């Protein structure tokens, strides 16, 4: 069979992604990626430590990240992204910048991290006050709050799940419930946006529904990572009815078929997390 008329495959541009060893949401990352871009993933080495500040530090050492980036150079990505929120905020703003520099030196290409992309997205959306949802323990959550505050953004509320493993098993319904708690207007006023932290937390399908209910932009770790990386390629992420990506959704756009003031519709669930989690909380 002569297939010469197809002329393909078409040229692809590459984004290298360094993910933590326990990252389980490869498919979610791809959902933000246009057809002409390919993701090339690698993972940090396994360490026998549960999700904690200790783990965040271990998987974000410059030598570890440099080695991971060098494994990607064979496929010549145009940008590399470190897809880990806690690993990129644990060292603060200065530490995040140093991380990007170390990755760029190793791969000779621009580098982004999830936490750096978060701050970039907050600037893009002109956010001065943000509510946070995390799957982390309180100690990890506090470091995220400090990271955001040092960037000049007020944290109006925060809900955390207290998980130390298998974060990818959290359901969309649980994410939505925690988002509502975090977004409640408190003494610091209403939030301009809501951030769903952790690249292992499923968020893609729940973002537009939460934006329609809460009437503020909702951004997530995987979303901002892909948005920032693709931005450096001069291309756009794919995300219908997501305020960060779709400008028409930045003024409280109602989803097609929804009446004004309607509540969050049913969202699909993903497999539940086992009963091995710490006490949930909010501040």
Regions found by a protein language model. Name each.
Residues 220-257, 280-283:
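C-terminal functional extensions of proteins
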Residues 181-213, 226:
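Hydrophobic alpha-helical
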Residues 78-83, 131-132, 190-198:
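Periplasmic-binding protein-like
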Residues 1-67, 133-174:
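N-terminal glycine-rich anion-binding loop in soluble enzyme alpha/beta folds
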Residues 69-110:
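Glycine/small-residue-rich loop that forms an oxyanion/phosphate-binding "nest" at active or ligand-binding sites
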Residues 253-274:
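Compositionally biased, intrinsically disordered low-complexity segments enriched
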Residues 61-75, 177-190:
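Short, well-structured alpha-helical segments in soluble
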Residues 99-164, 246-247:
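Conserved beta-alpha
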